[in-house]
């Protein structure tokens, strides 16, 4: 089974409504009581609950390099983006993301787009 996504607080909770049909079971940190918590707490929650982290923040990529995975990290390199744009990019890259989530070697996926 492919792990659901856990969106960091720097991504609006509104994305869940838009993305849930493509990535079932996904949540935003606010939904699980982690809004405003330290990155390490979010990391530990994702690890304990089988989520892949999605963030603009390089700190999660740094944690992945330091501690390995799980959790896996999808590092969004899209600049200042609306929820609609983030949804469009993740939907467009759904197959690439699914391949990454099944990959047992890679822990970080950097997502960039010209959308």
Task: Go through each PLM region and give its residues.
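Short, hinge-like loop/turn segments at secondary-structure boundaries
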Residues: 44-46, 70-74
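N-terminal first-folded block
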Residues: 4-49
């Amino acid at each position: 089974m492919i792990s659901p996504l856990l969106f960091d607080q720097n991504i609006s909770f509104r994305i869940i409504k838009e993305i849930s049909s493509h990535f079932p079971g996904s949540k935003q940190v606010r939904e699980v009581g982690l809004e405003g918590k330290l990155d390490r707490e979010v990391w530990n929650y994702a690890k304990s609950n089988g989520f892949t982290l999605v963030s603009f923040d390089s700190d999660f990529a740094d944690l992945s390099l330091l501690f390995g995975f799980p959790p896996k990290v999808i590092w969004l390199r899209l600049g200042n983006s609306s929820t609609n744009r983030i949804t469009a990019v993740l939907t467009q890259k759904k197959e690439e993301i699914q391949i990454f989530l099944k990959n047992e070697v890679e822990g970080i996926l950097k997502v960039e787009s010209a959308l």
